């Protein structure tokens, strides 16, 4: 395994629904996902998460709650993705489509797992139960999980 790069993922999770975005271009295009991306130099992880949410959905947020951290390895890629996962139930603004993402609300019993990253169906249940977690997923290409670990933790 090589070096890692910091990424963020933000889920707007309200009592009956979750906001996801359809990725329109780049890494993960054609899949529903939370909002996030690379943390920029000189930026805290949380500030990066807030910036990505604003850029991709038009929403602003005061408080984020860190709920998980997952390391992703893609066979053949030298860099690991160190993804810090946040959620919030309170945002300002109305979701708007950006050049990268098309936001849409989903009822919690209608989350489109078949059109999401394959790992989401493993850790989303922990997120919905308001549990914190650490994970590692090793992928062969974008669709095949070769190996994974996922555990609930008390704190991150």
UniProtKB/Swiss-Prot annotation:
Q: What is its EC number?
A: 3.6.1.56, 3.6.1.-
Q: Which GO terms describe its molecular function?
A: 2-hydroxy-ATP hydrolase activity; 2-hydroxy-dATP hydrolase activity; 8-oxo-7,8-dihydrodeoxyguanosine triphosphate pyrophosphatase activity; 8-oxo-7,8-dihydroguanosine triphosphate pyrophosphatase activity; dATP diphosphatase activity; metal ion binding; N6-methyl-(d)ATP hydrolase activity; O6-methyl-dGTP hydrolase activity
Q: Which organism is it from?
A: Canis lupus familiaris (Dog)
**Catalyzed reaction equations:** 2-oxo-dATP + H2O = 2-oxo-dAMP + diphosphate + H(+); 2-oxo-ATP + H2O = 2-oxo-AMP + diphosphate + H(+); 8-oxo-dGTP + H2O = 8-oxo-dGMP + diphosphate + H(+); 8-oxo-dATP + H2O = 8-oxo-dAMP + diphosphate + H(+)
Residue positions annotated to bind 2-oxo-dATP are 8, 33, 35-38, 117-120
Cofactor(s) the record lists: Mg(2+)
Q: What is its main location?
A: cytoplasm
Q: List the ranges annotated as motif Nudix box.
A: 37-58
> Which residues make up the binding site for Mg(2+) 1?
36, 56, 100
Q: Which keywords fit this entry according to its UniProt record?
A: Cytoplasm, Cytoplasmic vesicle, Hydrolase, Magnesium, Membrane, Metal-binding, Nucleus, RNA-binding
Cystine pairs annotated here are none
What protein name does the entry list?
Oxidized purine nucleoside triphosphate hydrolase
User: Which residues lie in coiled coils?
Assistant: none
Purpose: Oxidized purine nucleoside triphosphate hydrolase which is a prominent sanitizer of the oxidized nucleotide pool. Catalyzes the hydrolysis of 2-oxo-dATP (2-hydroxy-dATP) into 2-oxo-dAMP. Also has a significant hydrolase activity toward 2-oxo-ATP, 8-oxo-dGTP and 8-oxo-dATP. Through the hydrolysis of oxidized purine nucleoside triphosphates, prevents their incorporation into DNA and the subsequent transversions A:T to C:G and G:C to T:A. Also catalyzes the hydrolysis of methylated purine nucleoside triphosphate preventing their integration into DNA.
Q: Which family does it belong to?
A: Belongs to the Nudix hydrolase family.
Q: Name one GO cellular component term.
A: nuclear membrane
Please give the PROSITE patterns that the UniProt record associates with this protein. NUDIX, NUDIX_BOX
